[in-house]
From Swiss-Prot:
Lineage: Bacteria, Bacillati, Actinomycetota, Actinomycetes, Kitasatosporales
Catalytic activity entry: RNA(n) + a ribonucleoside 5'-triphosphate = RNA(n+1) + diphosphate
Protein name per its UniProtKB record: DNA-directed RNA polymerase subunit alpha
Organism: Streptomyces granaticolor
Keyword Nucleotidyltransferase: yes
Domain remark from Swiss-Prot or TrEMBL: The N-terminal domain is essential for RNAP assembly and basal transcription, whereas the C-terminal domain is involved in interaction with transcriptional regulators and with upstream promoter elements.
E.C. designation(s): 2.7.7.6
Gene3D superfamilies: 5' to 3' exonuclease, C-terminal subdomain, DNA-directed RNA polymerase, insert domain, RNA polymerase, RBP11-like subunit
Gene Ontology molecular-function annotations: DNA binding; DNA-directed RNA polymerase activity; protein dimerization activity
């Protein structure tokens, strides 16, 4: 059995909808194999939602105009194709737009049903004069890739329903490059860098995870031919081993103040792993453990790259400490003892 060092994946966030993913070390040649597969999957096979057809009050086809609207129907359709939407529904759903002029019609004027969200509300769709009025239905469906208006046209559809091109993919751009990286004395391993930019409907890490899931499912078909076939097995992750070692450390290694240490010990918290399983709210329930003790613990854990469990949204440890009377500085009934 051949055992290779397990690669690690790290994310470098460029902005909210663009990230670089670094996968290393990879066996020589696997950088391009994996990079090309991920890129093609990200661009073509990530599920999304888009408008598939519209119906405008008083309009029978796209080669016409709407009274009081500056843009003709063709321009209006081009603007609608720029809508970024997401839908939780597997079946088609309808959004409604009703606007009276004068003024701009934006995506914020669209009323989506529950489970559907418009992610670029500032998008300008049309311009109305004082007498202008726009009433429109927009049908949203889920899918993958690109579907033309011709394909969206349904047999026997109602008169006045106009199919539009649908771009379902939430991914805007994907590039990758492969660099050399070193493992001990060897310098021919691959380092894969994948740059992913998405629409507002999905974050890059979610798109990357979706692509990975799709590829695993497809490559699993080949594996099922002979599940006992020999391949390259991935060794244990160095990161996982280091994390396990940190979590197993006794809290004595944190070198906390005597007060904080004794409070944790009395609560039955003996290791770093048991400590990070508690939230700030949990720790404040411990007698004599106040906001200053929490700040001390958080600072020690941050130095190890760890953190406490998430507290409920809006939780303020200082306010909670005041409310429960947990005071680090004044407690007449508390007697400090040496660490035991």
């Amino acid at each position: 059995m051949l055992i290779a060092q397990r690669p690690s994946l790290t994310e470098e966030v460029v902005d909210e909808f663009r990230s670089r993913f670094v996968i290393e070390p990879l066996e020589p040649g696997f950088g391009y194999t994996l990079g090309n597969s991920l890129r093609r999957t990200l661009l073509s096979s990530i599920p999304g939602a888009a408008v598939t057809s519209i119906r405008i009050d008083g309009v029978l086809h796209e080669f016409t105009t709407v009274p009081g609207v500056k843009e003709d129907v063709t321009d209006l359709i081009l603007n609608i194709k720029q809508l970024v939407v997401s839908s939780e529904h597997d079946e088609p759903v309808v959004m409604y737009l009703r606007k009276q002029g004068p003024g701009l019609v934006t995506a914020a004027d669209i009323a989506p049903p529950a489970g559907v969200e418009v992610h670029n509300p500032d998008l300008v769709l049309a311009t109305l004069n004082a007498k202008g009025k726009l009433e429109m239905e927009l049908t949203v469906e889920r899918g993958r890739g690109y579907v033309s208006a011709v394909q969206n046209k349904q047999v026997g559809q109602e008169i006045g329903r106009i199919p539009v091109d649908s771009i379902y993919s939430p991914v805007l751009k994907v590039t990758y490059k492969v660099e050399a990286t070193r493992v001990e004395q060897r310098t021919d391993f691959d380092k894969l860098i994948v740059d992913v930019e998405t629409k507002q409907a999905m974050r890059p890490r979610d798109a990357m995870a979706s692509a990975g899931k799709t590829l695993v499912e497809l490559f699993g078909l080949a594996r099922e031919l002979n599940i006992d076939a020999e391949g390259i097995d991935m060794g244990p992750s160095p990161t996982d081993a280091a994390l396990a070692a940190d979590l197993a450390l006794p809290i004595e290694e944190l070198e906390l103040t005597v007060r904080s240490y004794n409070c944790l010990k009395r609560e039955g918290i003996h290791s770093v792993g048991e400590l990070v399983a508690r939230s700030e709210a949990d720790l404040l329930d411990i007698r004599n453990f106040g906001a200053k003790s929490i700040d001390e613990v958080k600072a020690k854990l941050a130095g190890m790259g760890l953190a406490l469990k998430d507290s409920p949204p809006g939780f303020d440890p200082t306010a909670a400490a005041d409310a429960f009377g947990a005071d680090d500085d004044a407690d007449a009934g508390f007697v400090e003892t040496e660490q035991y």
